[in-house]
Amino acid sequence: MLSSAFIAQINEILAPDEVEKLCLTLTETMPPVSIRLNPKKLLTPPSKCPSPYVEPQPSSGAFDLLALKDGRVPWCSQGFYLKQRPTFTIDPLLHAGAYYVQEASSMFVEQAYKRILAESEPQTLLDLCAAPGGKSTLWRSLLPDGALLVANEPIRPRAHILEENLLKWGHPDVVCTSAFPAEFARLKEFFDVVAADVPCSGEGMFRKDPNACAEWSHKAVAICAQRQWEIIRDIWPALRTGGFLVYSTCTFNQKENEEMLVQICRELGAQLIEIPVEKAWHIAGSTLQSNARPMPVYHFFPHLVRGEGFFLALLQKTSGTANHQEFKSKSHSPKRFGMKETFFKTSTSKFVPTTEPQTKSSKTTKRPAPKLDPTTCLSESQHFQLLSTGETIFAVRQTLFQEVQQICSTVKTLHAGIPLAELKGTNLVPHPALALSSEFNTNAFPTIELSYPQALAYLRREALTLPANLPKGHAIASYLSHPLGFLNNLGPRANNLYPQNWRIRNL
């Protein structure tokens, strides 16, 4: 049930007949279902099983996602609508990062990126409020290889969800951080683009989230607007002069949208940039009643577009001056993410324990640091340099190494580049996310092609019966040629190495 206060607010920005249509849409229709494909993991089932260790079995119970397609999202090249909402959790390809379930309206950021390209080619982009990762994975697919995406989420539980989705998406040129906007102020004019999908009152998501409808109030709108202003003000020093701010919300009201943009332009120094759109998309413009030239802003109203409520504007920073008190806190030590050029050494064995097996007649013989030949794990390892934090080793593109180190030494970093390996006890083992990387060399390990039931069992972290001819050691668990993760074949049994916190808990 929509509150009378909310309806009164909508009457201030829309004509009466439009208000009625919007309210009916919000209360009596279901939101459309849409997905976006991963261009580096295209959904093209192989004509034959690539693994010599097991023959593919009938995909009992599997659904064909491509058969559910119901047209393209017109403003996103990889976006598709579906005829119905399947149970995505039981599709192994979702867990492989082959696609992302994303609300269609929010895919409009692709058009903002195209407009930015008309002015410059951004090399550094910060997605400031990024969880759960829909827009971040889209930004990463839009940016060219060699450009850096920093995906940030200050709330730690949400940050780990963001990290999981980014790792499954598999692009190497990503840093995932968990910091508040003011902490980035030390990175003066570092980013070419800042995308801020700021926390809002959630009016555009009433169909998806009944709680947002129940909790809505004018007070909540005012609180959100104040928070949004603080977020943009705090991040402003990190955006280079001439760089771009992509500001978005999932709400309709002017206080969180048009009025916020006026404040940003006036107090921080920015200008609004127009984004070309097609009339057939039915995207609305500014709701401000003014005789002046309409603001170039983009409203997605659910009764007009096939999507949820969404608002976006593109701004260009014209001034670096702002009344800003620089955030001061204990900096993160650069040693946390340190260079490890000598850590890896060529070895005939991919993963070698740090100690010899101990017997009754011998003492443990210590070895140097664990050895791994990274050239066997990455398809183009010559382009990457190594970082370590704690017991995890990451591979970072050489051309981005300096920037990544600067970020890691400034804000809390969850991962940087490709998680390559981690130390477990005395053994160096492949990181679970390595198998999901688009740079992963699948020839480095034997591959076992799983049937649909086997893939679900693997994703539940259940034990699997492996073919007798599968070599001992680490192997790739794959479904329709998309790696899901690793197994460790011990001979009579195999350890399922799928991460505990990623497993499917309920079917």
Regions found by a protein language model. Give the residues of each.
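A short acidic, Gly/Pro-enriched loop at the edge of an enzyme's catalytic core
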Residues: 121, 185-195
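Conserved class I S-adenosyl-L-methionine
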Residues: 121-129
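Mobile active-site "lid"/loop adjacent to the S-adenosyl-L-methionine
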Residues: 157, 192-234, 250-257, 282
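Helix-to-beta-strand junctions that scaffold the AdoMet/dcAdoMet cofactor pocket
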Residues: 144, 239-241
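Polybasic, low-complexity RNA-engagement segments
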Residues: 1-42, 62-64, 318-507
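Conserved SAM-binding loop of SAM-dependent methyltransferases across substrates and taxa
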Residues: 132-145
